[in-house]
Amino acid sequence: NEGQVRSLKGSSVLIVGLGDIGREFGWRMKALGCTVTGVKRTPGGCPDYVDRLVLMDQIEEELPNADIVALCLPSTPETRHFFDQRRLALTRRDCVLVNVGRGVTVETPALCALLDQGHFGGLVLDVVDPEPLPMNNPLWGYRVILTPHVSGNYNQQSTYDTVIAMAVENLQRYLDKQPLKYRVDRKSGYRVSNNQE
């Protein structure tokens, strides 16, 4: 007996950050039959793949309710170590935590301390702090799925093709004197939303 097998269908998923990565993750989770709650920092419309939309100041009320918590945050002064010991401990003990945003949003020593206590039903990290993860980092000693954070390095042809297509599209928009897409507000560290373009 390998223990209980959990299904994605019917799972409650909390997606923290609804930028490009969060949107793609949410869309897939919804398609697999999950109930999706999205967390944003600013009010706005609720995407069709999100069942409920809450703001960041409500996150502590939402963390204990999720089967899966997906962190899709950028690295900003406000998000650095946002997931500290206190917030991580608010997740359910059997919660699956996924970080596909930036490693610095999670306080690694706090994460390890909770793992020592048997917290988390699963942990999937595409990003870590520090990155790359040194061989002597305690995270290597746990049952954690660590994936290489390679999407930005053109290690996959599809990533390279996407970046080239985005650059060509923006070059054409520039030549046509149209607003550029994929802009980032340097002050906030967040992408400028489409409705502001």
Description of each model-found segment:
Residues 26, 30, 115-116:
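Gly/Ala-rich phosphate-binding loop of Rossmann-like dinucleotide-binding domains
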Residues 17-19:
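Glycine-rich Rossmann-fold phosphate-binding loop(s) that bind the pyrophosphate
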Residues 40:
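Conserved acidic E/D residue at the C-terminus of a beta-strand in Rossmann-like folds
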Residues 1-12, 182:
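Phosphate-binding beta-alpha-beta segment of Rossmann-like dinucleotide-binding domains, i.e.
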Residues 94, 100-197:
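Rossmann-like dinucleotide-binding domain for NAD(H)/NADP(H)
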Residues 43-137:
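Rossmann-like adenosine-cofactor binding region
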Residues 22-23:
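N-terminal Rossmann-fold NAD(P) dinucleotide-binding loop
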Residues 12, 34-35:
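Residues at the starts of beta-strands that form the adenosine-phosphate
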